[in-house]
């Protein structure tokens, strides 16, 4: 992919370019070298929210710089150049798994033998702990939010005392049944999901596009339908700021995958590994990399996300 031009109306001339995404270059292995993204820059204006330059050490991401001004609009899906440095911002282990991210302030990620994250630690004390079955199915995630003024050095993981945790959010995955903080949250179905209030179920249904992206979520209300969520996407899965949501957060979005936005992570969980939609790449080597010698093992879907 090179250009994804946004427009509305029959000839796409209305609001042209509001949510366009342009790839300005690739290296010989297919790694993205430049990316420009437009979006909502304030509550009333639109413009460029990302102007990224990516540099590599082989196929491993080394540094990302952003020449655009970060948007003022709250909740914008964009790349945040927190480090604003020219040195190495991403560090990897000997198996090619990203361990440190200076822009997301990830001090360290620990992995299982299947290269799935078990602990993801942020420098401000926030962390995520994952539990899997023996075959790699995700069973549980514990999101911990630290109190203010906690500092974790890069390369380290810190066990917080109970008094240092301001909030804990636990999600259990029991097949198609999802529990949050010990209470039943939803039951996933082929068409969407159901929630329970007492013994009364409420059914929600997805309207998908040709890629399996959940575009609209509707709720069955007696004999009528209520629109609960509308999603629009950038080519690599970033979400538009004009998306609407009326009944709490429904995280299954691009390709029907779960988007984790807590603590600013903004990664999609594809099961075998997680995808960074802001950069259009994985941070873990493709388990089937030996079948695709001609392209980087970190590239997402051969750089053709809309086919």
How would you describe each model-predicted region?
Residues 1-11, 20-35, 55-63, 76-77, ...:
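A short glycine-rich beta-turn/N-cap micro-motif
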Residues 5-12, 25, 38, 95, ...:
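Primarily recognizes Gram-negative and organellar outer-membrane beta-barrels
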Residues 6, 38-40, 68, 144-148, ...:
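Acidic glycine-/aspartate-rich tracts in secreted/extracellular proteins
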Residues 18-20, 48, 84-86, 103-105, ...:
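Short, small/polar residue-rich loop motifs at catalytic or cofactor-binding pockets
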Residues 23-24, 52-54, 90, 109, ...:
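A residue-level detector for well-ordered beta-strand positions
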Residues 48-92:
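Extracellular/periplasmic ectodomains of large secreted or surface enzymes and adhesion receptors
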Residues 179-185, 190, 195-271:
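A motif-centric feature for acidic-aromatic and gly/ser/thr-rich catalytic loops and repeats
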Residues 222-239, 263, 271-273, 277-307:
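Short turn/helix-capping motifs enriched in Asx and small/polar residues
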């Amino acid at each position: 992919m090179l250009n994804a031009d946004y427009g509305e109306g029959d000839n796409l001339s209305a609001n042209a370019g509001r949510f366009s995404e342009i790839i300005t270059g690739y290296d010989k292995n297919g790694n993205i070298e430049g990316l420009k993204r437009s979006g909502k820059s304030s509550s009333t204006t639109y413009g460029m929210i990302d102007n990224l330059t990516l540099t590599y050490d082989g196929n491993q991401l080394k540094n990302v710089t952003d020449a655009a001004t970060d948007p003022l609009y709250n909740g914008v899906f964009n790349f945040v150049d927190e480090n604003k440095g020219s040195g190495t911002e991403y560090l990897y282990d000997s198996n090619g798994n990203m361990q440190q991210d200076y822009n997301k302030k990830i001090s360290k990620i620990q992995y299982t033998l299947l290269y799935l994250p078990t602990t993801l630690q942020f420098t401000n004390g926030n962390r995520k702990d994952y539990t899997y079955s023996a075959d790699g199915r995700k069973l549980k995630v514990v999101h911990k939010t630290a109190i203010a003024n906690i500092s974790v050095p890069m390369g380290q993981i810190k066990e917080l005392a109970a008094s240092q945790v301001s909030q804990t959010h636990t999600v259990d995955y029991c097949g198609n049944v999802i529990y949050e903080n010990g209470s039943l949250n939803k039951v996933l179905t082929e068409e969407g999901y159901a929630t329970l209030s007492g013994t009364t179920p409420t059914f929600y249904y997805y309207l998908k596009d040709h890629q399996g992206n959940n575009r609209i979520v509707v709720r069955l209300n007696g004999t009528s339908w209520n629109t609960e969520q509308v999603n629009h996407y950038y080519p690599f899965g970033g979400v538009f700021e004009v998306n609407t949501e009326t009944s709490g957060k429904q995280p299954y979005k691009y390709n029907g995958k779960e988007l984790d936005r807590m603590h600013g992570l903004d990664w999609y969980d594809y099961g075998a590994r997680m995808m960074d939609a802001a950069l259009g790449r994985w941070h873990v080597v493709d388990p089937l990399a030996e079948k695709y010698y001609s392209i980087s093992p970190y590239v997402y879907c051969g750089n053709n996300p809309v086919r």
